[in-house]
């Protein structure tokens, strides 16, 4: 169904090939995972399959690529669209409508299906992706994970024979990732051919037929997921592969009371916020402490209020009620803005400069930066300093945004899904950097679905449910076990709120 034969591709303006002598066959009905570190060439391989290369990305190709017997370089993209459906890493790049129902039906309308068939497919797609409650919602009101799920539903409605998925789990919570695995398994049972670029392989366990490891554009080896399961932690860090299941074997004794941790904190006192007058509260926090000198995880399902809370804390929005208190009393929006730096969930919103170096220097303002080259080294950005940020992979863009936050020297650093698109080794490096920042007395908040990251570096965690604090406390093994179980189960009709544990 898909065949690469000695394919070498270099983007226009680049002398370094993104793929080198790449050969791979994917049979009809197979599920194959492309894996490897950020920037290794996974997305380039996908673009050669779905026609994005050469229709949207120019460059030179030697060797050949074939999809269902067609050469993507020789046929029109609309011809491939009837065969290949794609879910991109950033769902915003494939939205054309303003509401979810119109978005999911858009592809079917372009296929000129009759109204009744479109309605049937749309209902089926919402049901299969487990997002029936999002039908008819505004795209602009959705969380990042909800947007990704809608993007998947819009492709599913078109019933392509080949699915190309570019890190589809990157913005999803644990329950949604489990649901995604179920969806992909269902597609495979129906005979679809699936090519996935991923760092997280756990949800594909039992679904993927094999994993293909790419390093520096070259196919290094093919593995079963059982081979991945047997990999050591060091081998996963070298190859960028996540563990199949979250590891809880690290030293998780509470780090909150270790010597050197600051006792300063920002107190959220009866903080409430709603997006529209007369609407229900998107955030309703009775009491929560943000500790300086610690790394705090903000957890919860998609739409739980995590990003809304981070905006309130950073002074980007004004709460309808309540106060945020510092050492000297209430903190105004202006004061919180001055002391905070936010790395957004979609980092494309905050990349402005023509080079990586200028982007990071912009965040530093007039202040001097020490150790900038060391930061580039830690985040694997060496050699990319003069590249345009928008030319980088999703994981590399995320690393640039993290480097910019470090350069800002703000007291409160808020990272919204900082490991989205990051491979295992870069996640570990980000975790070490977050700990180092906290040791310097700053507050680090990590809004995340990534429990591997939480286990690696977080001192405290708060779990939000419908905008309120469900549980708060130090990160230890028992908390992680509870959090993973909670985030994987459906509590839409339950009342599980607990008192604060710290």
Predicted regions and their residues:
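Conserved beta-strand-loop-alpha-helix hinge in the C-terminal portion
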Residues: 218-240, 468-490
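H-loop/switch region of ABC-family ATPase nucleotide-binding domains
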Residues: 198-199, 448-449
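Catalytic Walker B motif of ABC-type/P-loop ATPase nucleotide-binding domains
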Residues: 163-166, 413-416
């Amino acid at each position: 169904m898909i065949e690469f034969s000695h394919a070498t591709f270099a983007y226009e303006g680049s002398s370094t090939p993104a793929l080198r002598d790449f050969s791979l066959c994917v049979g009809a009905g197979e599920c194959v995972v492309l894996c490897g570190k950020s920037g290794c060439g996974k997305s380039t391989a996908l673009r050669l399959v779905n026609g994005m290369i050469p229709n949207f990305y120019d460059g030179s190709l030697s060797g050949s690529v074939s999809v269902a017997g067609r050469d993507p370089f020789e046929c029109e993209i609309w011809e491939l669209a009837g065969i290949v459906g794609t879910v991109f890493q950033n769902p915003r790049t494939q939205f054309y409508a303003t509401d979810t129902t119109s978005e999911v039906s858009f592809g079917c309308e372009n296929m000129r299906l009759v109204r009744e068939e479109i309605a049937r497919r749309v209902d089926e797609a919402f049901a299969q992706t487990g997002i029936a409650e999002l039908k008819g919602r505004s795209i602009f009101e959705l969380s990042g994970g909800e947007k990704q799920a809608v993007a998947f539903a819009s492709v599913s409605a078109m019933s392509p024979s080949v699915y190309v998925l570019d890190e589809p789990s990157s913005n999803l919570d644990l329950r949604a990732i489990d649901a995604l695995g179920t969806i992909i398994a269902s597609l495979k049972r129906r005979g679809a051919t699936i090519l996935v670029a991923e760092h997280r392989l756990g949800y594909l366990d039992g679904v993927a037929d094999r994993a293909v490891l790419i390093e520096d554009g070259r196919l290094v080896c093919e593995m079963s997921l059982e081979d991945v399961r047997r990999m050591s932690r060091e081998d996963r860090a070298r190859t960028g592969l996540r563990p199949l299941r979250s590891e809880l074997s690290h030293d998780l004794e509470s780090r909150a009371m270790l010597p050197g941790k600051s006792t300063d904190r920002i107190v959220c006192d009866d903080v409430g916020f709603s997006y529209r007058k007369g609407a229900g509260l998107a955030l309703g926090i009775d009491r929560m402490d943000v500790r300086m000198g610690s790394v705090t995880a903000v957890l919860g399902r998609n739409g739980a209020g995590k990003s809304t809370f981070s905006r309130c804390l950073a002074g980007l929005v004004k709460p309808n009620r309540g106060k945020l208190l510092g050492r000297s009393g209430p903190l105004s929006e202006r004061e919180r803005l001055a002391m905070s730096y936010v790395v957004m969930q979609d980092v494309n919103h905050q990349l402005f400069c023509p080079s990586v170096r200028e982007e990071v220097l912009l965040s530093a303002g007039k202040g001097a930066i020490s150790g900038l080259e060391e930061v580039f080294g830690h985040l694997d950005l060496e050699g990319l300093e003069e590249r345009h940020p928008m030319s980088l992979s999703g994981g590399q863009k995320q690393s640039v945004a993290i480097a910019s936050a470090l350069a800002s020297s703000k007291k409160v650093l808020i990272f919204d899904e900082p490991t989205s698109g990051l491979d295992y080794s870069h996640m570990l490096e980000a975790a070490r950097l977050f700990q180092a920042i906290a040791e310097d007395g700053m507050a680090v908040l990590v809004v995340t679905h990534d429990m591997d990251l939480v286990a690696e570096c977080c001192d405290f965690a708060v779990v939000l449910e419908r905008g309120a604090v469900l549980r708060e406390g130090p990160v230890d093994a028992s908390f992680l076990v509870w959090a993973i179980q909670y985030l994987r189960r459906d509590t839409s009709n339950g009342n599980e709120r607990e008192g604060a544990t710290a």
